[in-house]
Regions:
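A ligand-binding cleft/hinge motif common to bilobed small-molecule-binding domains
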Residues: 164-171, 219-220, 251-284
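Acidic, polar ligand-binding/catalytic clefts
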Residues: 137-200
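Periplasmic-binding protein-like
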Residues: 181-188, 266, 270-307, 325-339
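Extended ligand-binding regions for polar small-molecule ligands
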Residues: 57-82, 132, 192, 199-205, ...
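Bacterial signal peptide processing site
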Residues: 45-48
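C-terminal motif of bacterial Sec signal peptides marking the signal peptidase cleavage site
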Residues: 39-43
């Protein structure tokens, strides 16, 4: 979940789970983060956008995201949307299959089920729904995130559903269509003993990962907005190598809070009960996108399919079962740069 992936399950507590979760830093065992959670959270932090999961947090926190696997095909029963189907290129319609690229190592949006063969998460759900709305079969390709764009450009895949943020550079190479939101959140110790809020962090030590958008943009902006511009002490940024380090320091009370991709923080709270609370409101949310090769003849059909999904009950179902219910959008708009 790159800090703007702004990207993807139940973290399996077995050797197989650790391997599959290899890029998501998440599951803290007091006073340090367990290996499985660390690997899981690493994945979230390495994604495409700075992912977020909007589970049932409250102003006081209270991570309560999904803890079950949903391996059923959410697209069962979906009838093709004829307005989208009529936009399909003849070659794609004749082939009868859509090829999607995604990196299946980002719970809870994009990952592998405990059977180690079934792609699950919000992004596979959306990809399956896109194919169903277009009356096509779906082929899911599990590839490294940093190879997806070149794969699209080389026509190895038709599209990607990877929680990918729209940047100026990406928009030069890709067609990008919004499909939900992701953002930055703040975690505090369970029970929020200091009664902190997203906008009451002045003077407190807040962990951020080195080089992240949280360190470079969102924490300084929040500090100026809420604190220094009002004569209050600045938020004290504590730069750390990884979110795993930050959450470990939070558990050991060396810092007061952690600012990071919301999806990773919420998943950590879900997988390690009574360890963290995730504050509401979020620091920021921005749309993330489905992407295709620049000027792809398939883009209009995929965009129409996404709009049909958003307007259907399946969209709320997919968001809700992965703890993303606060992050839906109403329009599958052509993306604009978010950098």
């Amino acid at each position: 979940m790159e800090n703007n992936r702004t990207g993807r399950r139940t973290v399996r507590r077995t050797a197989g789970a650790v391997a599959a979760a290899m890029r998501v830093n998440r599951q803290l065992s007091i006073p340090i983060v367990t290996t499985a959670l660390a690997l899981a959270l690493a994945a979230c932090g390495a994604g495409a956008t700075g992912q977020n999961v909007g589970a049932k947090s409250t102003a006081q926190g209270g991570g309560s995201g999904p803890s079950a696997e949903y391996t059923d095909d959410i697209s069962v029963g979906v009838k093709p949307d004829q307005n989208a189907v009529k936009l399909l290129p003849a070659a794609v319609k004749a082939k009868g299959t859509l090829s999607v690229a995604m990196d299946l190592s980002y719970p809870p949006t994009t990952f592998m089920a405990s059977d180690n063969k079934t792609p699950i998460g919000f992004n596979p759900d959306v990809a399956r729904l896109v194919a169903a709305e277009l009356g096509l079969k779906l082929q899911i390709n599990n590839v490294k995130f940093d190879t997806i764009i070149t794969g699209l450009q080389a026509n190895r895949y038709d599209f990607t559903v990877s929680t990918m943020g729209a940047t100026t550079d990406r928009l030069k190479a890709l067609d990008m269509v919004d499909y939900f939101k992701a953002g930055t959140g703040v975690s505090v110790p369970y029970g929020n003993p200091q009664k902190l809020g997203t906008h009451t962090l002045c003077g407190h030590h807040v962990g951020v990962t080195s080089g992240s958008t949280q360190e470079l943009q969102w924490l300084p902006q929040l500090s100026k907005q809420d604190c220094t511009s009002k004569g209050k002490p600045a938020i004290k940024a504590v730069s750390l190598p990884s979110v795993n380090d930050a959450l470990t320091q939070l558990v050991s009370k060396r810092i007061d809070a952690v600012m990071y991709d919301f999806v990773a923080l919420e998943w950590a709270a879900t997988q390690q009960p009574k360890t963290f609370d995730v504050l509401k409101p979020l620091v920021t949310t921005k749309p993330v996108t489905v992407a295709l090769k620049k000027d792809s003849p398939l883009t209009p059909a995929v965009q129409a399919a996404l709009q049909a999904i958003i307007e259907s009950p399946k969209y709320a179902q997919a968001l809700g079962r992965w703890g993303l219910q606060d992050l839906g959008i109403k329009t599958a708009a052509t993306a604009v740069p978010q950098d």
